[in-house]
Amino acid sequence: MVTIQPDASEYGGQTVTGAAWPNIDESVLASAASDLEAVANHLRDNVVPSAGRQKMKLADSWEGKGADSALDEANAIIGEHEQNEVEAREAAAKLRRMEFAVAVAKTLANQTAEQVQNDCQRIMDEGQPSEGEDTRFERVATRIREGYDDNVRMVAEVSHQLAADLGIVPPEPWGHPGSPARTPQTPDQHPDGQLGTVDSGSSAPAPPPSLFAPPPPSRNADRPSQLGTEVAAKAEPTPSLETVQSGSPVPPDPLVGGEAPARSNPPFAQPHSDAPSTSGASTPPAVGPAPAPTTGSGTMRPQAPAQALPPGHLDSLSPATSNEISSNAVSPSAFGAKSGTPLEQFQKGLADAAKTGGSPQTLSTAPSQPLGAPPTTQPLGAAPPTAGPAAPPTTGGPPAPVAQAAGGPGGGAGPAPVAPPLSGGVPGGAVPLGPPPTPPPAAPVTTPPLASGAPVAPTGAAAGAAGGGGAQVAPIPVSAARAERDLAQRAVRRSGVDPMETARRIAAALNAPGMTNVEDFKFFWVTGLTADGKIVVANNYGIAYIPQQVHLPEQVYMASADESISPAERASWVNEPIVAVQRWAEHNGRVLRAVIATEDQLKNSDAGVHHEVLRPEDIPENGKMAGRDRLQVIAPDVSSQLAKIGDADLVSVLPPAPADSNPPEDRRKSLWDNVWKPLASRSAKRGERHLTAFVAYAAHAQEHALYAAHTAALPDEQRQAIREFIYWQHVGQLTADALAPA
């Protein structure tokens, strides 16, 4: 592979130096990737088969305990070889992504350089005016500076996207609050008439470089620095262009000070409006997520808590009816009380929520966050953020052993021991659904009610504040082929992440291997994208059903978990996820832009909008996403409050253990078969039968979760079992309410 060299033209060549050029040899990356691919192929084609043959010979000629031990060791060695192959391929794939990113950045930088060269040449060809001031040199200097700034932004954008694709935290972009800004320089006139600038005597340390750029060269305060060629100066000198007295071009330092020319399509959001500046110097904008909406007072819009578990204990609940699930808002103080122990706060919050009912889900009007953005959540009752985003609520520990104890598709755990009547709901009361957590606001933005359906653009300050810090969230999984296409498309657009790219990656991750249970016959997801960037998902199973291994990112809404829509209406979508995202958009005053799914999933359907088809090469090998588990999606407040309860108090939120200490009969397999069987039917009542079977399964799943919670050996196991108990109680009650006669 031939290394792409920077443009060497007189004017354009000055826009591909320093931070405006990825100073990495892509051929070295390609060579390293080829070596790792060769290692992986050798392990696959030679080492592992040879070891397997030796193991078989050993098994044929040796028996006894010694032979068994030897076979175990052989299996372990083969397993290590196979793991080495996997790791070699993963490393090679990352190197290929890096190689591609470097090539894209260099190609685009040279295209900008070529355009700058042509523009500057046309300016100089105008000739000296017969009268008036000769502004050619100043215009050339400005055009070079514009091209250089464009390339700096482009290289930073490519490097940050590459970092997100590789799952690493990208470096802070130049101009990020806290990064040093260089002291602006004072223009001066050289003795020979050349235009240049000299340092004012001191400069701050150089800002951190991008992922591609090498460290900037050191500077001497008494030596002129350069960006430009020999340009005879008859016009006013500009502080943004430097030349050497000898006329020979020198690679420039990264430019931070000075006003950057306005551009029509900057790829970055503006930096924080309150970022400190040095001597009036401006800094290149920083990358960051869009701000979340706030009320006019500057505080976060109160997030309505989900209708929760009733007073004190789960066993003291009275059956709830669909009439009790109203749209009355619950005061945030219900879960934000500061008095009492966490257990008392949890019980009080559940009691208050049970009395007033859940409130409808509220959508923000800010665009969805781009890939790699650090969304966070703020617990109810906390003070509005003033100096940074709040930490997301913690979950109840790893779900490992409970998946077997709680069982069922997705590791589901279960309800109270009595199958619930369709009209009355799950015994022990309901834990109805709640909205997903609302990200904390970045700056005061006035947001109208959702019903108006009119999106409001964030103010400049709010948009700038979006580039702030926060916990880095793991990127959405993406296949190598899709990552390359996205990078190329974004580079061509010369802009940030399109919401379609984010939505498509989420849709692909939901369709990845391991995100669907083997027992879930014909289960699939559909992802919708609205015109204002909202992402909504729906599947063809039940109401608010999510497989246990699936986590949804913070910015994703689930159509059937929206409590502002009646259970009966949500039941009418069951088994039809495309209809679900359409109705969700209509209900929330949104315009659907596209639906995203595989070709088979979109076959014989017409959503009335663009169909974005997922190809096999778009699907990543692993679809695990950072985000909310299924209880956090449908009942975020209950999940957050449960996380605050100490391990010793966990048993206090459970109903009493059954008198029979033996585990309940495991009928989850047969009951789940009844859930999916209606999907194979063409009967007009298949949706009703599907939901009826879901209620029965949810009741049995609660029973197993309750047993697992009372018999768990470790606090983490007990906590996870309780989460499963609450989840299946929510789903069972919601489904029963949906089936109840109007």
From Swiss-Prot:
Pro residues bias: start-end ranges:
205-218, 386-401, 433-447
**Residue ranges, compositional bias (Polar residues):** 318-331, 358-368
**Which portions of the chain have biased composition (kind: Low complexity)?**
421-432, 448-464
Q: What does this protein do?
A: May be involved in the ESX-1 / type VII specialized secretion system (T7SS), which exports several proteins including EsxA and EsxB. Involved in DNA conjugation in the recipient strain.
Provide the organism lineage as a comma list.
Bacteria, Bacillati, Actinomycetota, Actinomycetes, Mycobacteriales
Query: Which residues are the signal sequence here?
Result: none
Organism source for this protein? Mycolicibacterium smegmatis (strain MKD8)
Please give the residue ranges the record annotates as the region Disordered. Answer: 167-471
Name recorded for this polypeptide: Uncharacterized protein D806_0078
- Gene deleted: what happens? Loss of DNA conjugation when disrupted in recipient strain; strain still secretes EsxB.
**Domain of life assignment:** Bacteria
**Additional free-text comment from the UniProt record:** In the well characterized mc(2)155 strain this gene is interrupted and its 5' end is replaced; the last third of the protein is nearly identical in both strains (from residue 468 on in this entry). DNA conjugation in M.smegmatis is unidirectional with distinct donor and recipient strains; mc(2)155 is a donor strain while MKD8 is a recipient strain. Mutations in a donor strain that alter DNA transfer do not always alter DNA transfer in a recipient strain.
